[in-house]
A protein has these predicted regions:
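Short, compositionally biased
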Residues: 177-193
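Beta-strand->loop->alpha-helix junctions that form or flank phosphate-binding loops
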Residues: 37-40, 132, 232-243, 274-301
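Acidic, Ser/Thr/Pro-rich beta/coil linker or hinge segments at domain junctions
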Residues: 1-3, 14, 30, 280-323
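Extreme N-terminal cap/leader segments of soluble proteins
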Residues: 1-67, 89, 98, 116-127, ...
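Small-aliphatic-rich amphipathic alpha-helix that forms the alpha element of a beta-alpha
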Residues: 70-97, 113-121, 196-206, 219-225
Length: 323
């Protein structure tokens, strides 16, 4: 695939495009008047001071077409995306609540089954929520509470010029049937394996300067969010991004990863970070460098193109509120 086509298709990808409106919504809610809020918009979770601990709060909703297509997987993913958000911040998940909107009893039951399966898999309880049993639509949304400490807090907004960019992904998975952009690495693995993988970010957190889990915008879109939050640019060699054999490049770069992270660190910490990911069967490689400015550049087969220019483009992560 030519780089020009790749840039065009990623910029037009739904998971990327739908991030833009976040900026206007967040602008209406900033500034936050609380001395206990340490970081908010632009991060995977809000960061709240609570005594000696740091609390993490996040929420995610599931795309309506996924709820219609596969309600069990929608419920499962509603939990998965939240525990990944907490892990990406260097945190440990505590508990979740949900808002379930569905008038069809069978669909509702499948969504709940999916949530329960994921709660059991990741070891995070669902402790309450709210039900709309009479809506004209079906939707599931989950909010999560996590915790960490200051030495292990990983922000999206900490990347600095010259630092290596590391993509880390569990390549042992499969695309969910009927959901071509959902790379499932957790449903068929034991709870011991997936929980060990989630703990990896907490282990390496003191060595990272920034991090995000690879989510709906895909690998490059997620990195774009991190860079926008950090106020930086980058150069990335697409050919170095870990990818399973036989998987289409565009499909892979726009996939939601069951277990995938993009992180930055000091150059001296690179081997330590990559080796720690490897201990949890997560393949990690240096694929680029953080640069000064606002331009996100890609390289492939001798060609070089601009994917995003954050002086003009937004993925809903600028500026994050850090107090």
């Amino acid at each position: 695939m030519k780089l020009e086509e790749l840039v065009r298709d990623i910029r037009a990808y739904r998971g990327v495009v739908r991030k833009g409106p976040i900026t206007n919504v967040a602008a209406g809610l900033i500034p936050i008047q609380s001395e206990d809020v340490l970081a908010a918009y632009g991060e995977d979770a809000a960061v709240i001071k609570c005594g000696r601990e740091i609390l993490l709060m996040a929420a995610d909703g599931i795309l309506q077409d996924l709820v219609h297509r596969n309600p069990f997987w929608a419920g499962y993913c509603a939990v998965l995306v939240n525990v990944n958000d907490i892990a990406a911040m260097g945190g440990q998940s505590i508990a979740m609540v949900n808002v379930l909107s569905c008038s069809h009893e069978e669909v509702r039951a499948r969504i709940v089954e999916g949530m329960r399966a994921a709660c059991d898999k990741f070891g995070v309880p669902m402790v309450g929520g709210h039900l709309h049993p009479d809506t004209t639509y079906s939707a599931v949304d989950v909010a999560i509470l996590g915790k960490t400490d200051r030495s292990r807090l990983v922000l999206s907004s900490g990347a600095d010029v010259g630092e290596p960019i590391i993509f880390a992904t569990d390549l042992d998975g499969q695309f969910t049937e009927g959901v071509p952009y959902s790379w499932d690495t957790t449903s068929k693995k034991s709870k011991e394996v997936v929980r060990r993988q989630l703990r990896t970010m907490n282990k390496i957190a003191p060595y990272l300067t920034a991090g995000k889990d690879i989510s709906n915008p895909g690998a490059l879109g997620t990195l774009g969010m991190l860079l926008e939050a950090s106020g930086k640019g980058c150069v990335v060699d697409v050919s170095k991004i870990p990818r399973p054999k036989g998987v289409d490049l565009l499909q892979w770069l726009t996939a939601y990863q069951g277990c995938g992270f993009v992180v930055t660190c000091r150059e001296a910490r690179t081997k330590l970070v990559i080796d720690e990911f490897a201990r949890s069967d997560i393949t990690a490689e240096v694929c680029g460098t953080v640069t000064k400015g606002s331009v996100f550049e890609l390289e492939l087969d001798g060609d070089k193109r601009v994917l995003f220019d954050f002086s003009k483009d937004t993925l809903g992560c600028a500026p994050p509120q850090k107090l």
